[in-house]
């Protein structure tokens, strides 16, 4: 289930709902999907908000495969790696379908080239927690877009940034200011 397929699914959902154009927001894997949607269907994306994904969109392949392994582990007690434990605990707390998450992590490892990122013309917000050791650098990715800005979410890691007030306020301000 590769990222371009997930982006096509998002477009199909927009079609089904009768949404011709939208501000599209995604976090982590959702941000990767948002970027692919903005590249492949630019007329559909008014603006893009990429949370929890920085320059690893270009220079990385997504979440480490060990996180997929952690989703399939018998229990949290079987894990030693801090990052694997963090993601597994988050999935368990949210009663996520861990097998589906593992499959998505393994399947959504596609990157964009710097030229492809530069071809995304809509306004873009790249927002990452300052303690996020998964996403890559927000400022490096924002500099690759023609019209983007970076938002640092202070003292938040990959899992805590998504619900942070600074993130929410930054998104609202971005949407109010975009053309």
Regions found by a protein language model. Name each.
Residues 1-23:
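Active-site loop/oxyanion-hole signature of alpha/beta-hydrolase fold enzymes
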Residues 120, 126-128:
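Short beta-strand/loop motif that positions the catalytic acidic residue
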Residues 133-138:
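Conserved alpha/beta-hydrolase "acid-adjacent" motif
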Residues 89-113:
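Hydrophobic, aromatic-rich cap/lid helix
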Residues 148, 153-179:
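Catalytic active-site module of serine/aspartate enzymes centered on a nucleophile-bearing elbow/loop
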Residues 32-40, 44-75:
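Flexible "cap/lid" loop of the alpha/beta hydrolase fold
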Residues 129-132, 155-157:
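Acidic beta-to-alpha connecting loop that harbors the catalytic carboxylate
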Residues 22, 26-27, 31:
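Conserved alpha/beta-hydrolase "nucleophile elbow" surrounding the catalytic nucleophile
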